[in-house]
Design a protein with these regions (language model features):
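Nucleotide and nucleotide-moiety/phosphate-recognizing core
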Residues: 1-132, 140-156, 163-164
C-alpha cells in the first residue's frame, strides 16, 4: 500500500507512540521490512509453537518486551487504514479506570486492535495450556473500554481478510 507492506505501514503509524516494538511471525514467515526509524527499538520473534494463534504470539512476545513497559498495543498486521491518531485515541482512553481498550465495529470487539495493561496479557500461557486459543479468553475479570471508529472514517479499524479487500485497500 503506497509502496509499503501492511506491516511496514502499521509500524510507521505506531512508531511515534511507542518505546519498543515486538513483531512475532509464524515459523518460516518472511522477515518483514522494519522502517529505519524503528530498527533500533524493534525485536523480531516467532511463534515457538505453530498454529496456536494470537495467544501463542502473546506468550512469545512478552519476554522480548522491556519489563518497564506496562501498556502494550496488541495488533494484527493487516490494518491498512489505521493511523497514528487512532492509536493515540486508544492510548488516551486507557485511563486508570481501564485495563484494556479494544476497538469495536458493529458491536464486534476486536482484541487484536487494542491496548492492554501488561498483567492482562500475562495469563496467555496458562490459557493455551487449558486449550484456549482466542485472545478474548484474557478478558475475564478485567475492565474494558470499547472504542468505535468515528462516523466520518468508519473504515479506519477494518482489517483485510480477502484478496478483494486487499485490492480495495491498495486504491
Amino acid at each position: 500500500i503506497s509502496g509499503k507492506s501492511m506491516i511496514e505501514r502499521l509500524l510507521l503509524e505506531l512508531s511515534p507512540l511507542v518505546a519498543q516494538v515486538v513483531v512475532i511471525r509464524a515459523p518460516g514467515q518472511t522477515i518483514p521490512n522494519i522502517p529505519k526509524e524503528l530498527k533500533d527499538r524493534t525485536l523480531l520473534g516467532w511463534d515457538s509453537v505453530k498454529d496456536r494463534g494470537p495467544l501463542q504470539g502473546i506468550v512469545d512476545a512478552l519476554p522480548l518486551l522491556n519489563a518497564e513497559i506496562d501498556k502494550v498495543f496488541l495488533l494484527t498486521c493487516d490494518l491498512p487504514y489505521i493511523t497514528t491518531n487512532w492509536f493515540q485515541n486508544l492510548k488516551d482512553v486507557m485511563t486508570d479506570e481501564f485495563d484494556m481498550v479494544c476497538t469495536e465495529e458493529n458491536e464486534i470487539v476486536n482484541p487484536l486492535l487494542a491496548i492492554y495493561r501488561r498483567p492482562v496479557l500475562e495469563p496467555a500461557s496458562k490459557l493455551i495450556s487449558a486449550g484456549k486459543r482466542r485472545p478474548i479468553s484474557l478478558w475475564e475479570g478485567w475492565r474494558m473500554a470499547r472504542l468505535s471508529a468515528p462516523n466520518e472514517t468508519p473504515w479506519i479499524c477494518r482489517d483485510v481478510n480477502t484478496p478483494e479487500e486487499f485490492k480495495k485497500a491498495k486504491t
